[in-house]
Amino acid sequence: MDANASQIQGDCDDRFLAVKDEFRRNFQERSELGAAIAIHLDGEPVVDLWGGVAEPSTGRPWDQDSIVRVFSIAKAMTAICMHVLIDRGLIDLDAPVAQYWPEFATNGKSDITVATVMSHQAGLPVWQAELPKDGLLDWDAAIRALAREKPIWEPGTCHGYHGTTIGFLEGELIRLVTGKTVGSFLREEVAGPLQADAWIGLPESEEPRVAEVSIVEADPNSAMFAKLMAEPNWVGWKLIHNTGGTNDPANINTRAYRAAENPSVGGVASARGLARLFSPFSRDGAVDGLRLVRPTALPAMRHPRSASDCDLMLRLPTTFSLGFAKSWGARKSGPGNHVIIGEQAFGAPGRGGSIGFADGEAKISFGYVMNRHGGGVGLNDRGQSLVDAAYRALGYTSSDPGCWVR
């Protein structure tokens, strides 16, 4: 038995013991290093497990307070903030972005609506102009550059994963409407009141809790991606290569990149924090007497808004609601390139295989974080096995083309 598997700690309701078994197997058979999983059912914790090593260089163990970079789960954090403001009537989904951000109207963008941005249909999936080193650490410069961009496709006609840009597009709307940065709004009006450990822009006071991201595995579809990356004219090339160093492994564990408010890929959280953050949206928009949105806000968060068997950026099946990932494709997409969650669920995967989501039909909110990255752009077998076990425990079955249904 892997030593880390024998050190799993925390609590697990008897109904979800299969989740605990899979969590243990992740250490025994799937090369987990350090990780945590949390599940809330109807707002109450039913799984809260952790184990392994948080800092390989020192041997520091993963404990109940460990937090780690969760990268693109920041997109879901930002989308939650957007829906809070939409529900308050401060942002109109059908309004042009330029109504709030006049500088955005240049180069054929005057008619792009908030909903078009949130559904990855704006045609602005990357910065086409070259970003300088550490370019996404400078909010104002990144926003000015984004406002000058011209859509790659006609907005609203198709979709492609806005992997690096969507958080900045939404984050600037949040700043213009509230006067607060997205990280401040998240802490002051969402995660803070929920007492959820989730940040976009990590305070220095939280640094001692951070787990070190380690051991990036080879992409299971590396031959495919190597071919795509060798094509500079492919639009997705800049998703990887024009990020100002954001995707550079040398920057993953730096204080500067954890501190930066990057609402596309800059999330930091614990599994417990993610389960708590999504908990209101697994119910009616409220938990423990704290209401974030009215029940009428939930359909826009849940219902698919854009879907394709071949996302223009990822060249894989993807589906999005307004701001959130839904189930992505079938398991035949290959390890690391699918996200199989409930038909009614919404959330986001994070680089390396973490995930946070809510499912109002199943009444669960879910957070899984780890520090050993897997390949692909979705869930690898570690995270997916935990999701699968949770849904089976609730009596769900897996469907074709790839989601869990009752």
Regions found by a protein language model. Name each.
Residues 1-16, 322-326:
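Short, compositionally biased leader-like segments
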Residues 9-70, 92-95:
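Short, conserved catalytic-motif segment at the N-terminal edge
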Residues 17, 23-24, 43, 67-95, ...:
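Active-site SXXK
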Residues 64, 69-73, 85-129, 147-148, ...:
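Active-site helix/loop module of the DD-peptidase/beta-lactamase fold
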Residues 67, 126-210, 250-269:
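Catalytic-site signature segments of enzymes, centered on catalytic residues
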Residues 120, 166-173, 261, 265-287, ...:
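Active-site-proximal alpha-helical segments within enzyme catalytic domains
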Residues 213-271, 303-361, 397-406:
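Active-site Gly/Thr loop motif
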Residues 262, 283-287, 296-297, 302-310, ...:
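Short, gly/Ser/Thr-rich active-site loops of penicillin-recognizing serine hydrolases
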